[in-house]
Swiss-Prot record:
HAMAP family: DNApol_II_L_arch. Its EC number is 2.7.7.7, 3.1.11.1. The keyword Nuclease applies. This is DNA polymerase II large subunit. The gene is polC. Pfam families: PolC_DP2_cat, PolC_DP2_central, PolC_DP2_N. One of its GO terms (biological process) is DNA-templated DNA replication. It comes from the Archaea. Signal peptide: none annotated. Belongs to the archaeal DNA polymerase II family. Residues 279-299 are annotated as: Disordered.
Length: 1117
């Protein structure tokens, strides 16, 4: 049986168990409530589409692109007339249009996200002022989950449906246009920043041009001045509509124009204002000249420097992360690799920690790779060493005086391709050097390999182990006419020509020639200011008795390259001047540095509601804030709002809130909900007896139910969860959240699973085609297998024990998991779910990692419409979801069906998932042509995409599922820190002190700038906001949680308990002392110091009386 067949067979087995349990009638539904879907068409029908639409989608997919299918389906649904009512009746048209736009949007978003359900509130046929009919699409906040492109296409779909139904254009009034202008400005000032901030004129142009009304529900309690407009139902902000206009139509204008032309939809020509080049090259040049004296705009990641999250490197700063192209087995899909030694030395970077970066893209997650270059550090004793070993990094990190170079950042070609960002010049590295040798005329003629194994399976590890000394490196360079080996190439561009000339004169004053270096003690150089030049060049050396000692090879190289003075030409870069005098070609070792700062910490933690309940059973305020059902039961009878269910037995007809009638045992029907008195003590006692559990001290419930029908969970489930120390989420499932990281290959040893177990799961051979016979072989992971964190494995083990308890004690069936340790869970099925989606993805546990993350195939993450730039997703045991998930428990508010497994994708089709995964590199080495293209400058990745092997080139073939190779090996996917320093430090003072201490070590960071950044973008705005919030706050009851804008005259809550402030004085003061301390210790901008003083005055005025205190005459003597 093939892999997908195995998954499907196991899924059917679990469904059979769940179906048998549900048939007992103890749950509201008699069948599992998560339908299966094998492909996009079935997911769409399962989520939103009318019955039978899956078949039609599959027919159209044979000859159309996905976008064309979406629009064709929309047209067919919009023009049908078999809805209740008369043909051409507006209600029928609205119903058709509503179904059409939701189904088409579901197709465009892979049938995964909740936007088709929640992002579009409704559609409506409305009146223009001239009496014609127009079409309005009401967007809600969750449209954000679809992304800008899908939101834009939803508007275009609305226009297509409008035309299909023969409706006129939307004709906005001047007041309606100005309402949008005001809302955009209010949204940014009062709510949050938009990804694209349109100007007022751009908003006016868009609203006049869009042929449908883009409107929506109120999303924020912020009132507008343009009030009481006849066609706008709310006087508050319509966030969904603004997102659709600004981040959709305007920001994605190029895509709309493209699709409008392809589908021959007229009326969108006005968008060329946004897509046309704004000026000619001459005008751009003039603009550049006129703005030469203007300050440069800050890099995006530097705009918000957060306390405790250090800046690792300023934009393009020398000594930052060196750009190196390639992919290791745990990088790609927005995650990028650095050396684990770098992670250990800086301590703020652990596996899965987010970084906000300068390029490419906005952010990433860091993962380890030990076949790239580690950091170069200066120790307190003056030694300069390159650290390429984790244990060495741990042993010396307290002795580090300066981090001269942070090491490589391994960036996949696909990361540039994703945004079609022009390629930056690559680092000069071993894998490039080897290909230059291979391409040389000398090699082609003589086949002299110099001991290098040139074949298509050549691995970087072999190159790194090559024993090449300096003389041999120069010999190879001269014979092959290729640049000098990277090992003997220094960071010449990081120093000036004057400094190199100074160093040249100094060295040749001590040593006559490079050959003399190999004589006794000639590599001992007296220490003076030239040491700093050698440090910045990145040359390792030791200090002993006031002498600098470097290796003979490095000194020979330095003197051979700097054999005469460099040209003083000011227009010439240092590396160009070096090449003019060097006997061999010298490449720039680090032509591109990447800046970045620490972002969100890595995470692996069980999903808990606040406070965390064991059962979705309401107990009101009868147990106070602890919400313990056992405590509430001591009250005897309590009054709560519950579902009203009527017994279906005609001889009984008793009303209750249970699925089974408590009197006759027949099924009940849900009718409504109402407040009622229940004997909780008896219910709880019966529940304990039903599951044969001795009385527990604590079983936590909820204050009230937020679902529409108010149907509670059976108390028995809560008791069994409490018994196994697990907690439910709002839909009845138990979840564990982890940071997403990609993985294309694993080693049985590193995931803690014996190879025999791996064989049982259908794995047969390693990446070299050899049979699996030990725990150390590298194996390509199957696309729906995942490696969860050890803490996730331990929590799921508890969940499995709960499920077995549930099957035995509640459903009176055989246990299923019988797991004694987490390894017993290997091979079992899970459902993965992203928070903004409504479709789970079937997965299988294949192992465990010590890191705080969930490793999975890039396809698995993309199937959830996620990448790996710090996204966090949930994992749940599939049988738990099938037994306990209930749509009835979902919140009735907008967005309630988001983050719920309304459908389960059981098979991942690479062609149907998010296309970001199509950019994943599959190359054993980066082609030489790509390296050369990076040197040209400004080359777009799309122009050279045919030179690379990636997923996109494999789609539709069997190779899309396997053979996704990597260029850079790593010995372990969990090398380096597992928890970043930010999470281990308890106080903000400790975090900031550590942040600034690291800034003092980093050559690529300005310490004063970091201090000012933390104050300006974090502490000062936070204090100002807290002062404002303190003065506007409500008071809160300590028992029932009721809130009051003003303290009642009685001074207490209506329930008789005390009232307290909801915002404490401490929250206002928390950053004041540390801000003052930083302003005194560092020479920061006087303006920032004044801001601190003004805030301090305001705080003192808030908490202390401004009345002058009477003084005695003694005070004046």
């Amino acid at each position: 049986m093939d892999y997908f067949g195995m998954l499907e067979e196991k899924t059917k087995e679990l469904y059979a168990i769940a179906r048998e349990a549900r048939k007992q009638g103890k749950d509201l539904e008699l069948e599992p409530e998560i339908p299966l879907a094998k492909d996009l068409a079935e997911r769409v029908e399962g989520l939103v589409g009318p019955e039978g639409v899956a078949k039609r989608i599959k027919e159209l997919e044979k000859s159309m692109s996905r976008e064309e299918v979406a629009f064709q389906i929309a047209k067919e649904i919009a023009t049908k007339d078999d809805v209740e009512g008369q043909p051409n009746d507006y209600e029928v048209q609205e119903a058709n249009a509503d179904s059409a736009i939701r189904t088409a949007l579901a197709i465009l978003t892979e049938g995964v996200v909740a936007a088709p359900l929640e992002g579009i509130a409704k559609v409506k046929i409305k009146d223009n002022s001239d009496g014609t009919k127009c079409f309005g699409v009401y967007f809600a906040g969750p449209i954000r989950s679809a992304g800008g492109t899908a939101a834009a296409l939803a508007v275009l779909l609305g226009d297509y449906i409008r035309m299909s139904q023969g409706l006129d254009r939307y004709k906005p009034t001047d007041d309606e246009i100005e309402r949008y202008v005001e809302e955009v400005e209010l949204y940014e000032s009062e709510v949050t920043n938009l990804q694209y901030s349109p100007t007022p004129d751009e908003v006016r142009l868009a609203i006049r041009g869009i042929p449908v009304e883009v409107t929506g529900e109120q999303t924020d309690p912020v009132e507008v001045q343009n009030r009481d407009l006849p066609r706008v139902e709310t006087n508050n902000l319509r966030g969904g509509a603004l997102l659709a206009v600004a981040e959709g139509v305007i920001q994605k204008s190029r895509k709309i124009v493209k699709y409008a032309k392809t589908l021959k939809i007229d009326g969108w020509d006005w968008l060329e204002y946004f897509t046309a080049p704004k000026s000619t090259k001459e005008e751009e040049k003039k603009k550049e000249e006129s703005s030469e004296n203007k300050p440069k705009k800050k890099a995006k990641y530097m705009e918000d420097i957060i306390g405790g999250r250090p800046v690792m490197s300023y934009p393009g700063a020398k000594g930052g992360f060196r750009l190196r192209y390639g992919r290791t087995r745990d990088s790609g899909l927005a995650s990028m690799a650095i050396h684990p030694a770098t992670m250990e030395i800086v301590e703020f970077l652990a596996i899965g920690t987010q970084m906000k970066i300068e390029k490419p893209g906005k952010g990433n997650c860091v993962v380890p790779c030990d076949s790239i270059e580690g950091p170069i550090v200066k120790l307190k004793n003056g030694d300069v060493i390159q650290v390429n070993d984790v244990s060495k990094a741990i042993s010396i990190r307290r002795d580090v005086n300066e981090i001269i170079f942070l090491g490589d950042m391994l960036v996949a070609f696909g990361e540039y391709l994703r945004g079609n960002i022009p390629l930056d010049v690559s680092a000069w590295c071993e894998e490039w050097w080897a290909q230059e040798i291979e391409a040389s005329e000398y090699f082609k003629e003589t086949h002299d390999t110099f001991g290098i194994d040139f074949n298509e399976n050549m691995e970087l590890n072999a190159l790194l182990k090559l024993d090449i000394d300096a003389k041999k490196a120069f010999d190879i360079a001269k014979k092959t006419n290729t640049p000098l080996h990277p090992k003997f190439t220094f960071y010449y561009n990081d120093v000036t020509k004057e400094e190199l000339n100074d160093l040249h004169n100094y060295l040749y004053s001590l040593i006559d020639s490079p050959e003399d270096v190999f004589k006794s003690d000639m590599n001992r150089i007296p220490i003076d200011y030239h040491k700093r030049i050698i440090e910045v060049l990145g040359i390792p050396h030791h200090v002993n008795n006031k002498s600098l000692i470097m290796s003979n090879d490095n000194l020979y190289t330095l003197m051979s390259v700097l054999n005469k003075s460099l040209s003083p030409d000011e227009d010439m870069e240092t590396i160009e001047a070096v090449n003019m005098i060097s006997p061999v070609s010298i490449k720039s070792k680090a032509p591109t540095y990447i800046g970045g700062r620490v972002g969100r910490p890595e995470k692996t933690k069980e999903r808990l509601m606040k406070p965390a309940p064991h059962s979705l059973f309401p107990i009101g305020n009868y147990a106070g804030n602890i919400r313990n059902i056992v405590e509430a039961a001591k009250k005897g009878t309590i009054k709560v709002t519950l579902a009203k269910c009527k017994c279906t037995n005609p001889d009984c007809k008793v009303s209750s809130f249970k699925a089974l009638c408590p009197v006759c045992g027949s099924r009940t029907e849900l009718e409504s909900s109402a407040a009622k008195n229940i004997k909780l003590d008896k219910l709880l006692m019966d529940a304990f007896e039903n599951v044969n559990v001795r009385r527990l001290d604590e079983v936590k419930g909820v204050k009230g139910l937020i679902s529409e029908d108010k149907y509670p969970e059976p108390l028995e489930k809560g008791i069994l969860r409490a018994r196994n120390d697990v907690f439910t989420y709002r839909d009845g499932t138990i979840r564990h959240d982890s940071t997403d990281l990609p993985l294309t290959h694993f080693i049985p040893r590193e995931v803690g699973v014996p190879y025999e177990k791996i064989l049982e799961m259908g794995y047969t051979e390693d990446i070299y085609g050899k049979p699996i016979t030990n725990d150390n072989q590298i194996i390509e992971i199957k696309i729906q297998d995942i490696v969860v964190s050890e803490s996730c494995g331990d929590y799921l083990l508890k969940v499995s024990k709960f499920i077995d308890d549930l099957l035995i004690r509640y459903y009176h069936m055989e246990p299923f998991y019988n797991a004694e340790n987490r390894v017993d869970l290997v091979g079992h099925l899970i459902a993965g779910l992203a928070p903004h989606t409504s479709a789970g993805v079937l997965g299988r546990i294949v192992g465990f990692t010590k890191a705080s993350c969930c490793y999975a195939h890039p396809y698995f993450h993309s199937a959830k419409r996620r990448n790996c730039d710090s996204d966090e997703d949930a994992v749940m045991l599939l049988l738990d979801a099938l037994l306990n998930f209930g749509k009835t428990y979902l919140p009735s508010t907008r967005g309630g069906s988001m983050d719920a497994p309304l459908v389960l994708s059981i098979r991942i089709d690479p062609e149907e998932i998010d296309d970001e995964s199509h950019n994943i590199d599959c190359m054993k080495r980066i082609p030489l042509e790509i390296y050369h293209k990076t040197e040209e400058g400004g080359v777009k990745p799309s122009d050279v995409n045919d030179l690379v092997d990636n997923v996109e080139s494999r789609l539709g073939t069997d190779n899309q599922y396997h053979g996704l190779m990597y260029s850079h090996p790593t010995s372990s996917i969990h090398a380096g820190p597992k928890i970043c320093l930010y999470k281990t430090l308890q106080t903000m003072t400790d975090k900031v002190e550590s942040q600034i201490a690291l800034a003092e070590l980093l050559r690529a960071v300005d310490q004063k700038g970091v201090v000012e950044g933390v104050l300006n973008s974090h502490f000062l705005p936070d204090m100002a906001g807290n002062i404002r919030a303190f003065s506007r706050q409500k008071v809160r009851c300590t028992k029932c949680g009721a809130k009051y804008r003003r303290i009642p005259l009685s001074g207490e809550c209506t329930c008789g308990n005390n009232l307290i402030l909801s915002i404490s004085k401490g929250s206002v003061l928390k950053y004041l002392d540390i801000s003052k301390d930083l302003s005194h210790r560092y020479p920061i901008n006087p303006y920032v110091v004044e801001r601190i003083e003004i805030l301090e005055t305001g705080i003192n005025s808030l908490f202390e009386s401004d009345k002058s205190k009477q003084s005695s005459l003694d005070a004046f003597f």
